[in-house]
């Protein structure tokens, strides 16, 4: 028997905190010159002489934000990165670095942590961001992930929530509602499996919805597209908590009103078909769903010609004076006050 066969398998306990960090981060690649020092010291060192630093943090908690009965750990790692990068792109910035912290209970073997981190590293490599630090600790209950994303932008290109003006166009990237419906499909199949473990789910009719829920993509491509079109939005936000909530955030911060047109909301055919199957209203799903990670922005009318006909961008409404309020115009041309219907972490 060889010496290697006599070695006990590595575990989280045998590695310890610092050994685990070394084990997980040994293959990390550095993509940016702004990363002066990454993993391995007391703090990362970042520097860019011309651009301003953008910082955002998101936390994901097992049982609140994800269910490991149908969320693969690799996908969870990937999605946790996307949620943070999306916020940087919503500021019209370039995401360049992340820090990764997690608390994990002793029910998870080392292989599970490796799978989680593989998803994080896959996202980091694909989106060209540097993992520059983080922390690990034990948890008495489940899994907690906290990622901080850092990015940079020229001061004149940074897009806040508070710049929308009356008569600006309301523009949405991609389509919405699919992530929420993907969650509904997975929850339904979970209940079916619990009732009959021998029942194997057939998810072939819901591939787009499930991918949008389990493995979303942040819209880095839109930031590049806007730069190529020489367009700087007046205000922007990512659609993580539902379209209606995000519109209301833009209006509140910009002190404007808005008219959203129901018939302009972009929906994938799979969303429409699944809403019919589940007896759900597709507009309600679009307004309240969340986790789409699309970008929603205010655009000056003078820039409309630059985006006209672009398949990635849809004009779904326009901003008004604040006194006119925030409304959705239905397909029947009825004007209805819009209410915030999105995700709330503190709802009971």
Residue ranges and their predicted role:
Residues 1-72, 100, 348:
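Extreme N-terminal cap/leader segments of soluble proteins
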Residues 2-19, 23-29, 107-130, 140-145, ...:
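Glycine-/charge-enriched secondary-structure boundary and capping motifs
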Residues 33-37, 215, 285-288:
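Short Gly/Pro-enriched turn/cap motifs at secondary-structure boundaries
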Residues 45, 84, 92, 131, ...:
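Residue-level signal for inorganic ion chemistry
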Residues 60, 96-189, 318:
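Glycine-rich anion-binding loops of enzyme active sites
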Residues 73-97, 118-126, 225, 245-250:
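Small-aliphatic-rich amphipathic alpha-helix that forms the alpha element of a beta-alpha
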Residues 182-199, 203:
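Short, compositionally biased
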Residues 200-249:
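Polyanion-binding loop/helix "lid" in catalytic or ligand-binding cores
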């Amino acid at each position: 028997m060889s010496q290697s066969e006599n070695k006990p398998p590595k575990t989280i306990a045998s590695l310890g905190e610092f050994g685990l960090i070394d084990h997980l981060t040994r293959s990390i690649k550095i993509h940016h010159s702004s990363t002066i020092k990454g993993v391995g010291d007391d703090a990362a060192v970042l520097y860019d002489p011309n651009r301003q630093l953008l910082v955002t943090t998101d936390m994901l908690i097992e049982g609140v934000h994800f269910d490991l009965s149908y969320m693969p750990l690799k996908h969870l790692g990937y999605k946790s990165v996307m949620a943070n990068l999306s916020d940087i792109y919503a500021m019209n910035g370039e995401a360049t670095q992340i820090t990764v912290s997690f608390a994990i209970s002793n029910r998870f073997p080392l292989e599970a942590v490796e799978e989680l981190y593989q998803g994080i590293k896959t996202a980091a490599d694909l989106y060209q961001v540097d993992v520059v630090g983080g922390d690990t600790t034990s948890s008495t209950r489940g899994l907690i992930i906290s990622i901080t994303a850092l990015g940079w932008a020229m001061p004149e290109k940074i897009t806040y929530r508070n710049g929308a003006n009356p008569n600006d166009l309301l523009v949405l990237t991609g389509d919405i509602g699919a992530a929420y419906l993907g969650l509904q499909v997975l929850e339904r199949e979970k209940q079916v499996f619990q009732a009959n473990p021998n029942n194997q789910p057939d998810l072939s009719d819901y591939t787009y919805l499930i991918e949008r829920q389990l493995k979303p993509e942040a819209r880095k491509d839109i930031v590049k597209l806007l730069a190529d079109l020489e367009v700087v939005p007046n205000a922007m936000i990512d659609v993580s908590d539902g379209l209606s909530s995000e519109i209301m955030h833009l209006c509140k911060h910009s002190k404007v009103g808005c008219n959203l047109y129901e018939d302009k909301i972009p929906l994938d055919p799979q969303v429409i078909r699944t809403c019919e199957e589940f007896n759900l209203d597709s507009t309600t799903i679009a307004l309240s769903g969340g986790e789409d990670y699309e970008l929603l922005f205010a655009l000056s009318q003078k820039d409309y010609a630059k985006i006209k006909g672009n398949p990635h961008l849809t004009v779904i409404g326009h901003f008004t004076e604040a006194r006119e309020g925030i409304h959705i115009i239905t397909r029947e041309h009825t004007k209805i006050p819009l209410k915030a219907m999105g995700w709330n972490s503190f709802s009971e």
